[in-house]
Amino acid sequence: MSQQNQLEPTGFTTRTIHAVHDARYDASVPPVYLASTFGTAGEDTTYMYQRGANPTRDNLQATLAALEGAEHAYAYPSGMAATAAALGVLEAGDTLLLGMPTYGGTYRFATTELTKRAVKTRFISDFTTLSDEDFTPDVKVVFLETPTNPTLQVTNIAAVAELAHRHGALLIVDNTFMTPYLQRPLELGADITVQSATKFLAGHADLLAGVAATNDPDLAVLLHRGQLVSGALLPPIDSYRLLQDVKTLALRLERQQQNTREIIEFLSERPEVEKIFYAGSSSAEQAEVQSRQARGIGSVFSLLLKDGGDAQAFARALPIFVNAVSLGGIESLVSLPAHTTHGAYAQEHRDEFGVDDRLVRLAIGIEDVQDLIAALEIGLKAAFAG
């Protein structure tokens, strides 16, 4: 491609498709390099061994960095591998401020693996009350999801970043529910953003991957070390597949969000439903924050059945929806957080953060919305049939 024909794309989907280019052969789709080792006789030793670097993974990482608005992005074999790499900044004697509720895997990592490393964890249930007094000298990292899983509470990323940085602490944001299409935490002050690429980025429930991104060169070294030293890196074939999948992210999410809005409207009129949790639903303040820092509500939400409702009967009877954990795929899913993703929670934390047995999480796909609504009617009737 000649220099005069080059244009820096500004649109999100344009970047997903054209962020990387096969300069050698001008192929419309960059090739996949499966080699485990590369010749080193020449001057260029960028690629020596697949664990250190791989052209296909580099193409993916360059694309992910462009989408995140980041200088550096790194691909891992799972979202938890990305989270573990980011939390590798913590050392013995440090304290982590962990936003709650949070994904069960993150909770388990903090309460087991970090504890073994002599890292303390303090749980934060309401970031609006976070103050200077919370930042003792040992606090090095704040880790949060916004919106949270599974009750979709929203946190003001910019406000927490400003407070954390004032005390020399880092802010890590799990952006799985929003993706960089809807929300870009690094632009709001976060130091690292992580997400399970298994979910929306891949979008077809057939690939496991994670990503961490940063603008800080020192943190980039840490994140790359998380790949290199532990071997937690995404293989070339999975990198290639994710590179292809992410090209349709915006199209999928727009359809998923539209379905979600219509389903929430339907459920809000149902007498069987006590409460619906979606990003910004808890208060006018949270709605304002969500509208300011994100471009929508995403396609994951939870509902609380009224007393007497049987969530397990609801999930079992629900047609079309797959009764399974995960989210972000083209197919709609139903799960019961208390028994699945958040089963690792101590009972006191389940009670405190609203992970109730009657809580049902729905991840909406791209099916025709009238079919999803018809399926939900069947599930609601089954939940109260006893």
Task: List each language-model region with its residue ranges.
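PLP-dependent enzyme catalytic core of the Aspartate aminotransferase-like
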Residues: 2, 10, 111, 121, ...
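Conserved C-terminal alpha-helix-loop-beta "cap" of PLP-dependent enzymes
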Residues: 275-360, 364
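Conserved N-terminal alpha-helix of the aminotransferase class I/II PLP-enzyme fold
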Residues: 32-33, 37-84, 88-89, 105-112
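Acidic-histidine catalytic/liganding microenvironments
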Residues: 67, 267-271, 318
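A common structural junction motif
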Residues: 230-231, 318-328, 379-386
